[in-house]
Amino acid sequence: MQRYDIIRMIGKGGMGEVYLAYDPVCSRKVALKRIREDLSDNELLKKRFLREAKIAADLVHPGVVPVFTICSDSDPVYYTMPYIEGYTLKSLLKSVWQCDSLPKDLAEQTSVATFLSIFHKICSTVEYVHSRGILHRDLKPDNILLGLFSEVVILDWGAALSKEMEEDFLSDIDVRIPGSLFSNMTIPGKIVGTPDYMAPERLRGTPASESTDIYALGVILYQMLTLSFPYRKKKGQKISLRHQISFPEEIAPHREIPPFLSQVVMRALAADPRERYRSVSALKADIEQHLQGSPEWTPKIVLHTQDRECWKFHEPILLSKYFPMLEVSPALWYSLAISKIESFSEVRLEYTLLRKGLEEGFGILLPPSEGVDHGDFYHGYGFWLHIKENILSVSLVKNGLEIQKTSRHIDGNKEKFFIAFEKQNHRLSLIIDNIVWTIHMDYLPARGGRIGVIIQDVADVCGNIVVLESSGSLQVSCLAVPDAFLNEKLYERAITFYRRIVESFPGRKEGYEAQFRIGIALLEKASENSDSEGFIQALEEFSTLHNSVAAPLEYLGKALVYQRLGEYNEEVKSLLLALKRYCQRPEISRVRDHVVYRLHEALYSNHRISLVFMLLALHVAPESINASEEEHFLQNLHGKIQDTLFCNLDISPVDFRSSKMELLLSYWSGFTPFLLGLFQRSWDLKDYRALADIFYTAADLGNKEFIEEYSGILRENIRTTTFSKEIVEILPDQLLCFLSGLEALTLQESIEKVFDGIENLDPVLILYLFDLFAKDALIHGRGEEILKAIALVEKYISPQQRYRYLLPYEVLSYLWMKDANKVYDLLSSYDESSWIDDSSHAFVLYGYWLALAEDSSLAYLHLSGCREDSVFPRALIGVFCSPLGICEEQLSYQERRQLLLQKFIFFHCLGNSEERDKCRTAYDSKERSL
């Protein structure tokens, strides 16, 4: 274990102890599980401990924690895994057992809908495990970990058994070991598993099977649906009595459990194994059927692919012009055909495509009827399908933006593909060969219903396109008529009909939806006429939904208005209010979907608001961000990560789905509502380093209210908590000293007060205080005080830290004092090649020196040599000096502050005190506007 730095213990079980550790070789935090020292001499238990690790290591699935290393020749034996922040399903269930009322956030976490999503992931994992010939044999909530970002992971493979192994390997061994040591473990010589989750035949000694794992899943599902056990075990109770199980809807009528789900769970809990599901795949399929719905479709229209009576064929289009993000050659031209008929409100399209058509790319679109003939066909929804190297990719496109993508490997010999597109109950689905590939929910009123097809060769469509209508839509929605008027921009007529619906359906879903669409109609009308009064009317209409069942729609509507007006602070505030106040309302899913769309929209336009929506999406819809998008986002954030002090001082990389990423996004966006949640999470984990990062961020953003309120809370927490002697990065006493320094800094107290007790601080905390002090001193014309601070702190940090973090401020201090010779001497500490490298601090510092000692034209010439696509905020002044200048719409809150500080120094060196002072005033008055 010498390779790892142990940070603290995070769990303890029957045979093992789990620690949070740091792996310096791979620069990452890991979970290290080792056998208990008092059991390490028992060869049988050691063999079983290693067997658990090897089974887990052989499984590759998102629902199984991968094993990094297994050390069987060390003493004690151990293995390592990724560290996942989260909690067990048992702890979540336990938090709501026998509770009469629940907080809103906990009620949402334990809703039937949320639990079904979790259970589906559990089934997927067990389905995979069974396909590998392995039985878990101890499935229970205590062995299911729920990550902070929607991960669902099955733990503890100590009882797992391969089908090739004899069950006697564990159950028929007689080992005499003190019973007190094994209160929390499966004991050799006894039936393996947890009795409350065992099938009746298993308790009678029958060997484990897939059916017994299915029974355990049934118990878990019953708990999820009812928040209680399917039976109550009493001493002396016979096994047969256990199966007097009540239906879930009878046990928990307030949970509104659908009868279908009740049938599913009762089948999984059948006393007779022959009456249970034959496989986990069958159980999972029924859960999917409930989650997705299974409508009956009736053929209505057949669109003959080459019949001009059915289609209007347009001139060939260059697809890369309209969909630049799609995988198409920029030189390829495609045929575009728009149907002459409009589809139904709930519609299914069926067609068969040749492989050749998919290799070239095929698009199916639902563009608005307005403007289709004038090049606006790409507005609306659609799917783009493309095969490359036996990988079939499906992209969901909205208004020209790719907002979702799914890719899977396909059979290289397959030549035809049956494809179905469904639009039903706000849900868009794409099915390929009867397998659902993509599902998306859209709740805004549809704008038109014509069908568009984009393909290189129409002959690649085998036969015709069949349009089917849902049996559920045979009764026309009362909203269809005003929706048609809205689609044709007949706003007053649409509003009149919507109001009639509101009056006819008071307190019902149809009435609330009509009220929401009145606001949409007013918004569209105001946007078309640039009518400021119209925007106010739209806001007033959305306000009528306040405190109703459809209350989330009030804030969704207001967010749409503020987005059109460019008032992004108010837009985000509206969305956040909906997400916080109404997290249990059914309509909240519409707000979540809109957040995800706005994230893609902002990223595509490179707008500064993208950081805020990335943060919101991580909180409310993390499952909507796939692995390739994660990688893309991390690439976009590379420069910001490099220029963030708390990231630089932490040698482990920033994971996308982590608390540190949330803090990073808060820091650069200036969006701080989630700091409280991060504070509470870090305190629960006793992660003092993370707490220091949070307070540093709040101080740098000028959030004095947070520091004043939560420094007191943290002090009280530390005072009333008994701390164990675990290994930690930063001690509680050091954190308290750091808080005192922060408070002195916010109160503008003396330098001695700010750095009082510095000799007791960790170097990380010293550098945090110095960075905050130096920025404040610089912008307020106290550059000479930076030198005093350097003299105070340099003896407590390493030479490398002094060079990297203190030297740039030392140069800036002498620039403020206009000591050109000293500045040049200090610049000589950098390699001269770094003077022209815009990723280096020396690049900008050299530009400042040129402005001070040489000529302004030379300074502008040097700084304008910065790459226009530079990703490093430290070089923003270079982009500012370039011929094209800088677009502030693309700068986040923190980037705008850094640019003001850089311009402040630059104009000071140029001797332009008027512009310099303007920068200082703007810096001091800079509100955290998005």
UniProtKB/Swiss-Prot annotation:
<dbReference type="InterPro" id="IPR008271">
    <property type="entry name" value="Ser/Thr_kinase_AS"/>
</dbReference>
<dbReference type="InterPro" id="IPR023507">
    <property type="entry name" value="Ser/Thr_kinase_PknD"/>
</dbReference>
<comment type="similarity">
    <text>Belongs to the protein kinase superfamily. Ser/Thr protein kinase family.</text>
</comment>
<dbReference type="GO" id="GO:0106310">
    <property type="term" value="F:protein serine kinase activity"/>
</dbReference>
<feature type="binding site">
    <location>
        <position position="33"/>
    </location>
    <ligand>
        <name>ATP</name>
    </ligand>
</feature>
<protein>
    <recommendedName>
        <fullName>Serine/threonine-protein kinase PknD</fullName>
        <ecNumber>2.7.11.1</ecNumber>
    </recommendedName>
</protein>
<keyword id="KW-0723">Serine/threonine-protein kinase</keyword>
<comment type="function">
    <text>Together with the serine/threonine kinase Pkn1, may play a role in the specific interactions with host proteins during intracellular growth.</text>
</comment>
<dbReference type="InterPro" id="IPR000719">
    <property type="entry name" value="Prot_kinase_dom"/>
</dbReference>
<dbReference type="GO" id="GO:0004674">
    <property type="term" value="F:protein serine/threonine kinase activity"/>
</dbReference>
<dbReference type="Pfam" id="PF00069">
    <property type="entry name" value="Pkinase"/>
</dbReference>
<keyword id="KW-0808">Transferase</keyword>
<dbReference type="InterPro" id="IPR011009">
    <property type="entry name" value="Kinase-like_dom_sf"/>
</dbReference>
<dbReference type="InterPro" id="IPR017441">
    <property type="entry name" value="Protein_kinase_ATP_BS"/>
</dbReference>
<keyword id="KW-0547">Nucleotide-binding</keyword>
<keyword id="KW-0418">Kinase</keyword>
<feature type="domain" description="Protein kinase">
    <location>
        <begin position="4"/>
        <end position="291"/>
    </location>
</feature>
<keyword id="KW-0067">ATP-binding</keyword>
<feature type="active site" description="Proton acceptor">
    <location>
        <position position="138"/>
    </location>
</feature>
<dbReference type="GO" id="GO:0005524">
    <property type="term" value="F:ATP binding"/>
</dbReference>
<keyword id="KW-0597">Phosphoprotein</keyword>
<dbReference type="InterPro" id="IPR011990">
    <property type="entry name" value="TPR-like_helical_dom_sf"/>
</dbReference>
<feature type="binding site">
    <location>
        <begin position="10"/>
        <end position="18"/>
    </location>
    <ligand>
        <name>ATP</name>
    </ligand>
</feature>
